Amino acid sequence: MIIKREMRQDKRAAPKAPINENISAREVRLIGADGEQIGIVSIDEALRIAEESKLDLVEISADAIPPVCRVMDYGKSIFEKKKQVAAAKKNQKQIQVKEIKFRPGTEEGDYQVKLRNLVRFLSDGDRAKVSLRFRGREMAHQELGMELLKRVEADLLEYGSVEQHPKMEGRQLIMVIAPKKKK
């Protein structure tokens, strides 16, 4: 099967605003390079003004009547937008859900290790999913699991708050804890 290269690139490319001669309207509301309103002018006049200032005429709002166009350096504005998107992406933190698994018979030493890991996850700003798995006859003693999750909740009170209270899903008791907001 042959796939044309142009078709794949078109899907990835963002829709571009019409510029210069590609603007189809006869009249446009023109905004100057410095942001001032010039008014409603013919497309030929707008192109002439853009050409005199050695900039591009870019259609900002095609929905308006007449369409709004601005005199600007199109390449520079695209570059600035890409830079802003990259900066926003860089500053964005991906919140993950980390999971710690307990058992009804989890001993004190193991409990403390798992609790330390939960504290670390919440301090890093990640949500924590605490699951407690019952095997075999342990299902008859679900109250022990509930007590263990209540203890975890009490121990993590200063680091986070319960987002999803303990509930049974099959043979597991699951609780989700969200980190406290930083001031």
From Swiss-Prot:
Pfam families: IF3_C, IF3_N. GO terms for biological process: ribosome disassembly. It is found in: Cytoplasm. GO terms for molecular function: ribosome binding; translation initiation factor activity. InterPro entries: T_IF-3_C_sf (IPR036788), T_IF-3_N_sf (IPR036787), Translation_initiation_fac3_CS (IPR019813), Translation_initiation_fac_3 (IPR001288), Translation_initiation_fac_3_C (IPR019815), Translation_initiation_fac_3_N (IPR019814). One of its GO terms (cellular component) is membrane. The keyword Protein biosynthesis applies. IF-3 binds to the 30S ribosomal subunit and shifts the equilibrium between 70S ribosomes and their 50S and 30S subunits in favor of the free subunits, thus enhancing the availability of 30S subunits on which protein synthesis initiation begins. Monomer. Belongs to the IF-3 family. This is Translation initiation factor IF-3. The gene is infC.
